[in-house]
Amino acid sequence: MNNIIKMLNEEQMKTDVPQFGAGDTVVVKVRVVEGGKERLQAFEGVVIAKRNRGVHSAFTVRKISNGEGVERAFQTHSPIISSIEVKRRGRVRRAKLYYLRDRSGKSARIREKLATK
């Protein structure tokens, strides 16, 4: 029974998900259906939380839109996600960046992780 569940979970998982973590700036392209038409909607922001649970993995992205903070939670292996692109790597020391909710402006900036040689 356990092997069947594991096999079904592996079958539903996507293989083209890039490596990213909290502090990284990502662009998530989401399929949106409006009146019979399907289009891609991009949501760009900072990953403030990531949860790794196999097929149930999820992550939360935060962005500032018109001066207002907007957060959106995504299931990593969801069929509505077309692609995930990592724009920049952030250097943080926490796994969950919920403290960014209380900050704005320069104090909400995240240092960039420089590539090692």
Curated annotation (Swiss-Prot):
InterPro entries: Ribosomal_bL19 (IPR001857), Ribosomal_bL19_CS (IPR018257), Ribosomal_bL19_sf (IPR038657), Translation_prot_SH3-like_sf (IPR008991)
Any one of the GO CC terms: cytosolic large ribosomal subunit
Superkingdom of source: Bacteria
Record's function text: This protein is located at the 30S-50S ribosomal subunit interface and may play a role in the structure and function of the aminoacyl-tRNA binding site.
Name of the protein in its database record: Large ribosomal subunit protein bL19
Similarity comment: family membership: Belongs to the bacterial ribosomal protein bL19 family.
Alphabetical list of Gene3D superfamilies matching this protein: 2.30.30.790
Lineage, uppermost ranks: Bacteria, Pseudomonadati, Pseudomonadota, Gammaproteobacteria, Alteromonadales
Disulfide bonds: none
One Pfam family this sequence matches: Ribosomal_L19
Gene name of the encoded protein: rplS
GO MF annotations, alphabetized: structural constituent of ribosome
Coiled coil region boundaries: none
Protein's GO biological process: translation
UniProt keywords, alphabetically: Ribonucleoprotein, Ribosomal protein
Source species: Shewanella halifaxensis (strain HAW-EB4)
